[in-house]
């Protein structure tokens, strides 16, 4: 089955996170990526990376821990006639170089051991016990991969505390703002923009 979001055609896969309100909020609030080197962590279907290609990004690297997502994102890039380098990586593990823009829609649901699902989809939701496990690892490693003057965009849920994210970014030398908000049942979604000073 092929769906279309904002003019981007996407094949779906049962083991890959299907774009939802969080993906769309990030998509509609992307920073200017024209002529920029872009890295997306956790590409899923490839929607955001493909949008960056259509908006004129110079180079795009997209990674995901889920091999089904990497394969699907490659197929979707082909479907939309764009050139993107997709490969498997646990966050920055297999990434080299520095980027102007880094994008991340992390798994943010607080998940106990008995709530985990036996599927690659678990990677898309499971944020650890407090929902911050993956996000905090990402923030800690982020300065090694973002150029000075570069920007990171993080999709944040009120479930995992935007203040905590902001308070972790600032001491690392980031100027932080919330650029978009969306109330959905049980939570508020936000896009956090943080510039490396």
Curated annotation (Swiss-Prot):
Keyword field: Methyltransferase, S-adenosyl-L-methionine, Transferase
Molecular-function GO term, any one: nucleic acid binding
Binding annotation for substrate: 105-108
Amino-acid positions noted as binding S-adenosyl-L-methionine in the UniProt annotation, renumbered to this chain: 42-46, 64, 105
Entries under SUPFAM superfamilies matching the protein: S-adenosyl-L-methionine-dependent methyltransferases
Catalytic activity: L-glutaminyl-[protein] + S-adenosyl-L-methionine = N(5)-methyl-L-glutaminyl-[protein] + S-adenosyl-L-homocysteine + H(+)
Enzyme Commission no: 2.1.1.-
A cellular component term, taken from the record's GO annotations: eRF1 methyltransferase complex
Highest rank taxon of the organism: Archaea
InterPro entries on file: DNA_methylase_N6_adenine_CS, Euk-Arch_PrmC-MTase, PrmC-related, SAM-dependent_MTases_sf, Small_mtfrase_dom
GO BP annotations listed: methylation
Family label: Belongs to the eukaryotic/archaeal PrmC-related family.
Function: Putative protein methyltransferase using S-adenosyl-L-methionine as the methyl donor. May methylate a Gln residue in target proteins.
Protein's name according to its UniProt entry: Putative protein N5-glutamine methyltransferase MJ0928
Species for this entry: Methanocaldococcus jannaschii (strain ATCC 43067 / DSM 2661 / JAL-1 / JCM 10045 / NBRC 100440)
């Amino acid at each position: 089955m092929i769906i279309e979001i904002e003019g981007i055609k996407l094949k779906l896969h049962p083991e890959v996170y299907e774009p939802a309100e969080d993906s769309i909020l990030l998509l509609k609030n992307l920073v200017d990526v024209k002529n920029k080197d872009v890295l997306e962590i956790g590409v899923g279907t490839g929607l955001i990376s493909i949008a960056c290609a259509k908006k004129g990004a110079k180079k795009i690297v997209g990674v995901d821990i889920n091999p089904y997502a990497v394969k699907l994102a490659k197929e979707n890039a082909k479907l939309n006639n764009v050139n993107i380098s997709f490969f498997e990586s646990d966050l920055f593990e297999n990434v080299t170089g520095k980027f102007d823009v880094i994008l991340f829609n992390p798994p943010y649901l607080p998940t106990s051991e008995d709530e985990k699902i036996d599927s690659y989809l678990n990677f898309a939701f499971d944020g650890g016990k407090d929902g911050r496990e993956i996000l905090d690892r990402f923030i800690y490693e982020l300065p090694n991969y973002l150029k000075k003057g570069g920007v990171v965009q993080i999709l944040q849920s009120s479930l995992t505390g935007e203040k905590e994210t902001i308070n972790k970014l600032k001491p690392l030398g980031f100027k932080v703002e919330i650029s978009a908000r969306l109330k959905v049942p049980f939570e508020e979604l936000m896009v956090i923009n943080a510039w490396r000073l």
